Amino acid sequence: MKSHYNIWIAESYSCQNDIIQLLKNSNLSSHLTIFCSHSKQRPELKLHADYFFQQPVVKDSSDWLLEQCKEHSIHLLFCGKHSQFIEQFREEFSRHDIQLVTGARGISKHKNVNNKFLFGQICEGLNLPSISAAKVAHVNELKQAIDEYQQRYSVICAKPVYGVYGAGFVQLSDDVSYFMKFQSNTLCNTQQFIEAYAQLEPPIEYLIMPFLQGQECSVDIACSNGKILALVTRIKFKFYQECYIEHPCHEICKILVEHFQCDGLINIQFKQDDQGAWHILEINPRPAGGFSYTQHTGINLIAELIAEKLHLVLKRPVPTTVVQVLPIIQSIKNGL
């Protein structure tokens, strides 16, 4: 067994620096040299990684990443953004003894979680608590789905079939003014949404769904080959978050992680209905932007993942069952 490994953290969302710092703060640090890359200028990554490189945009980066990994003798490549573009080249990385971590094993699994309509159908087929949804791809289909769902549910919403959670999501209401869209990006007049959708060329596939008005939670999970290594649930409040190492959604997560062969640092979103029952919103096969809040429970999710993949021994503090975490924003001067 090797005692030192070169790992590469490819472009991720806002949490990429957190990933690097959490590895540096663990006892794994002495066993790792951390390379990282991003397509944009990210000076904070240069501060904390051992080596930083400017990479092509993710969808065009597979060849570049493979060549860099070969040149620098990389043992593990972690992809935290649009990783389906890299997953399709898993065999090429494997031929060079490079472990590839993309959030799920197999391009079909990525397709199943990235298509939110298909994902919901699969969850329903597994008898898991999903949310009813109508898929539309034309303004006439949109009108019909809105009419149907307004008759069935007191409040409805719309969100794209593809995309990052929250992007393009709106709650629809007949009773708000058109101007409300400029005051709240998540609340829109129903007719205004229909008119805006009619102008799309080509139309975007959307889902019309009931809007659940209960509490929402976000489960951050380190997993390997469809098995959970560690998980923490976060509940977000306006000025703080609460983190739990035990939560009712965890049993559902085990089923989802195994079925979709999740593999990496991922995030699963849930929301409660009026009766307090939890429903699955989606799986993100990537780390959530706020996953680092979970470190205050004593569970270091990214370290758990890397320790498992590289067969390293991770030293773990005694975890805290429930913690309240406050964000602190601080600025530093960076020398040019």
Briefly describe each language-model feature range.
Residues 4-8, 155, 207:
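Residues that mark the start of a beta-strand
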Residues 1-105:
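ATP-binding N-terminal substructure of ATP-dependent carboxylate-amine bond-forming enzymes
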Residues 45-47, 62-65, 108-117, 166-167, ...:
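Short, charged, surface-exposed secondary-structure boundary motifs
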Residues 182-256, 260, 271-279:
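Phosphate-binding site of ATP-dependent enzymes
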Residues 4, 72, 239-336:
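ATP-dependent carboxylate activation and anion-phosphoryl transfer catalytic cores
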Residues 110-205, 225:
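Active-site nucleotide/adenylate-binding loops and adjacent lid/helix of ATP-dependent enzymes
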Residues 73, 97, 127, 153-154, ...:
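Residue-level detector of structured alpha->beta connecting loops
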